[in-house]
């Protein structure tokens, strides 16, 4: 009888895995390079999308661009019988630095695909609406921003088109953020809005430049991309900082776990791509729209191309010494944009289908031969068990794993706590795993 139960249990796991794999591959197949190209061209055609540019014209400036984005989200919602909640999230900022030279409304365009089971748990994909040229305060010159960041914005719209055809347990937010080039103002506004409204955020996938394959060094690479993540939350408490000094976890904050999740799912479902876990908040001394979320303790990463071309980035359109400058559409590789949009779409789907991670996870095993764990048992009937991941302390990613049943404590025999780092995930009946949960406390 017991053997029969074991066989049935593993048959269910295999069946669930097959359904999950089918969903992921179907999503990949539906991402359209042609639609991405058309949307990038449309955004470029607005001439400039500078945060301080025209908001009245129907054909030029950031006002026309954000109205078009909102219209696209509304059309997607119409096609899925109203499955998206589309609105402007408005923020008023007074001039306060060298890049915000006048008072301005910085308006984000938000589309929420509400989850069927956890409507207040959100996984977010963002792109930036605004663009700039060499002078960050020049809001009149043509600033096509084809790669920076029409690619990320078009990818967000395309992900919404595809994922709106499916239902997920958690909510997905697709958002165009404004004011990035002037100082990350749109992200600051939405992160504050999320905190005010008590959003339970799984994480934000910030897409900022996902279309360039030829670097300033001449190298061409259309098979890799970077995932930037900070090591630990910026708002951690003094106690958390104190504990980490003695118990480890210097590279195991919530953003780093999100980055590992994206890395591992990409390697599994898109093996021709080579994701690179970059252990930095962002590029050296620079910033992106995931940072305002990180500042409030939310998990967030930046997904972007491996090779940047600084002749195209933040440049007036011109030719000097036979070198072409400017972020024009000729510099965008649309097949590559499709690949990175697919990376986003499948990770949104996987995380939107995932159960909550184990709560109050504690670790023990000091001066003992085996490491042990305890956590709060999730009593929801679709949780079929948990899975322990571990790695050597010098390794960037999880190396080993062990599936366990519906329990709230477990001892990993003959694995010494000193030599490894650990996390645990929840697994639901459909085979979806939660984000990795790193222990937050200890016990004897």
Question: Can you say where each PLM-predicted feature lies in the sequence?
Answer:
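Metal-dependent peptidase/peptidase-like ectodomains
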Residues: 177-288
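Active-site-adjacent mobile loop/cap segments within catalytic or ligand-binding domains
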Residues: 44, 210-231, 277-353
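Alpha-helical metal-binding/catalytic segments enriched in His/Glu/Asp
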Residues: 111, 125-131, 135-184, 344
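Conserved aromatic anchor
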Residues: 369-382
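Short beta-strand segments within Ig-like beta-sandwich modules, predominantly Fibronectin type-III
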Residues: 400-407
């Amino acid at each position: 009888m017991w053997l029969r139960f074991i066989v049935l249990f593993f048959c269910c796991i295999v069946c669930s895995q097959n359904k999950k794999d089918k969903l992921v591959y179907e999503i990949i197949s539906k991402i359209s390079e042609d639609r991405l190209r058309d949307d990038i061209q449309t955004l470029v055609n607005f001439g400039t999308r500078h945060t301080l540019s025209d908001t009245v014209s129907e054909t030029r400036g950031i006002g026309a661009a954000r109205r078009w984005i909102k219209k696209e989200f509304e059309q997607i919602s119409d096609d899925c019988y109203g499955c998206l909640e589309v609105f402007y999230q408005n923020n008023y900022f007074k001039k306060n630095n060298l890049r915000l030279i006048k008072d301005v409304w910085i308006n984000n365009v938000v589309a929420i695909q509400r989850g069927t089971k956890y409507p207040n748990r959100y996984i977010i994909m963002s792109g930036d609406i605004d663009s700039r040229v060499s002078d960050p305060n020049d809001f009149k010159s043509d600033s096509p921003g084809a790669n920076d960041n029409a690619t990320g914005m078009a990818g967000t719209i395309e992900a919404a088109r595809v994922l709106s055809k499916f239902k997920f347990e958690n909510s997905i937010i697709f958002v165009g953020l404004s004011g990035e080039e002037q100082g990350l103002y749109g992200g600051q506004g939405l992160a504050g809005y999320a905190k005010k409204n008590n959003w339970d955020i799984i994480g934000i996938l910030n897409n900022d430049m996902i279309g360039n394959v030829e670097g300033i060094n001449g190298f061409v690479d259309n098979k890799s991309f970077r995932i930037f993540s900070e090591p630990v939350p910026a708002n951690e408490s003094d106690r958390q900082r104190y504990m980490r000094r003695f118990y480890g976890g210097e590279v195991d904050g919530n953003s780093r776990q999100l980055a590992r999740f994206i890395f591992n799912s990409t390697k599994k479902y898109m093996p021709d791509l080579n994701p690179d876990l970059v252990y930095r908040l962002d590029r050296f001394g620079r910033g992106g729209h995931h940072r305002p979320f990180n500042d409030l303790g939310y998990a967030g990463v930046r997904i972007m191309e491996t090779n940047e071309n600084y002749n195209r980035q933040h440049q007036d359109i011109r030719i000097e010494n036979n070198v072409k400058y400017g972020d024009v559409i000729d510099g965008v590789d649309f097949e590559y944009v499709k690949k990175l949009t697919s990376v986003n779409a499948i990770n949104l789907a996987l995380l939107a289908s995932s159960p909550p991670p184990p709560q109050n996870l504690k670790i023990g095993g000091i001066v003992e031969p085996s490491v042990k764990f305890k956590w709060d048992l999730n009593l929801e009937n679709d949780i079929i068990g948990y899975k322990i991941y571990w790695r050597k302390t010098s390794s960037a990613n999880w190396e080993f794993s062990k599936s366990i049943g519906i329990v709230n404590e477990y001892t990993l025999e003959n694995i010494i706590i000193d030599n490894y780092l650990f996390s645990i995930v929840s697994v639901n009946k459909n085979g979806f795993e939660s984000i990795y949960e790193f222990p937050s406390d200890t016990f004897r």
